Regions:
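Catalytic cores of nucleic-acid ligases and guanylyltransferases
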Residues: 1-162
């Protein structure tokens, strides 16, 4: 999901180009509160269970009820300046600075220094999915699915009740 702020307008744009701002008002309010004129933040909307773990099924029911949060992992544009050509470390540092003090609706995604298999084993033990991030749509995106995660066990649905 891209959180796009341009002046006073905030949109939450899905991969399919749909604006979900009306569904996630807490995220919109958090982006509106940022001390910038404009920005584009790349992230994933999540809802957490009572243990603080992302829960896909819970997110389905949060479509019309906050709290859902945007787990931010990249800053693509800031105050009209494109950052896509900057190193990911610089973009993440600017994103961390931008989100510093943000209390609700937006969180900075964790970065792990451990090797991928170690991180995946921790995610698997927690019942989480697990993805490796790369900016933009790419064939290099690697999503290793945990077959035991609740999101993998659910039945496919055509409509989320939007």
């Amino acid at each position: 999901m891209l959180a796009r702020r341009d002046g006073g307008r905030v949109r939450l744009v899905s991969r399919r180009g749909l604006d979900w701002a009306w569904r996630f008002r807490m995220i919109v309010a958090a982006v509106e509160a940022l001390a910038v004129r404009s920005c584009i933040i790349d992230g994933e909307v999540i809802a957490c269970d009572s243990n603080g773990l992302a829960d896909f099924q819970l997110l389905r029911w949060r479509l019309h009820h906050d709290p859902a949060i945007l787990c931010a992992f990249d800053l693509l544009e800031l105050d009209g300046h494109g950052l896509r050509d900057e190193p990911i470390e610089k973009r993440k540092a600017e994103l961390a600075q931008l989100l510093d003090g943000c209390r609700h609706g937006l969180v900075l995604n964790c970065v792990f220094d451990d090797p991928g298999p170690v991180v995946f084993e921790h995610a698997r033990a927690l019942g989480c999915e697990g993805t490796r991030y790369a900016a933009g749509r790419t064939d290099n995106w690697l999503k290793v699915k945990n077959p035991g995660a609740p999101a993998m066990l659910r039945k496919p649905e055509e409509d989320w009740g939007g």
